[in-house]
């Protein structure tokens, strides 16, 4: 699941299919991260192996003299959230995603193209998921990758967009709200 959506994120970023005005206005993509922050080998900066704890002082944004977060609205600064995200998702090329998911590269590309086409002011795309996404040890990351896709495409807060959890017996309302029953 994470590899599949990681590949979609890479595809959106590599082909400039993100909704730039939306991304600049409604996300932290332009925010400049502390240059001391890092993420290597699955560990964030500040990890103390002896204490098994983090010093989180590098986990911050750069601020100006007034205490406001610095921005790079060109999204080119290597310390902006957008560039750090690009670097992180660069590993999810079609070949790797195909080998992890078992999905042929051509099929991945077809899905990525179709869904990325919703990243325009006159389009919308929704992601619907069921309990399976939540019943993994990486459930938070599953939902987070859905959120990143939808924020990049501007599909949050618009009619026909969003991320919608469908539930079974505990709450059938979600299914009926979406006219699926």
Where are these regions (language model features)?
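Long, well-ordered, tryptophan-enriched scaffold segments
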Residues: 1-118
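A glycine-rich, hydrophobic/aromatic-adjacent loop/helix-cap motif
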Residues: 89, 106-107, 111, 115-181
């Amino acid at each position: 699941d994470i590899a599949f959506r990681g590949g979609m994120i890479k595809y959106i970023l590599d082909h400039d299919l993100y909704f730039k005005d939306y991304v600049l206005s409604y996300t932290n993509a332009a925010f400049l991260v502390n240059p001391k922050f890092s993420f290597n080998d699955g560990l964030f900066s500040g990890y103390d192996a002896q204490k098994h704890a983090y010093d989180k002082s590098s986990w911050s944004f750069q601020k100006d003299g007034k205490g406001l977060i610095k921005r790079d609205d060109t999204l080119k600064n290597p310390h902006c959230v957008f560039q750090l995200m690009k670097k992180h998702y660069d590993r999810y090329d079609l070949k790797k995603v195909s080998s992890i998911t078992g999905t042929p590269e051509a099929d991945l590309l077809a899905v990525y193209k179709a869904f990325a086409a919703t990243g325009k002011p006159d389009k919308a795309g929704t992601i619907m998921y069921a309990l399976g996404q939540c019943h993994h040890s990486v459930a938070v990351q599953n939902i987070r990758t859905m959120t990143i896709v939808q924020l990049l495409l501007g599909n949050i807060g618009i009619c026909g967009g969003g991320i919608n959890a469908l539930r079974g017996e505990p709450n059938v309302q979600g299914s009926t709200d979406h006219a699926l029953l």
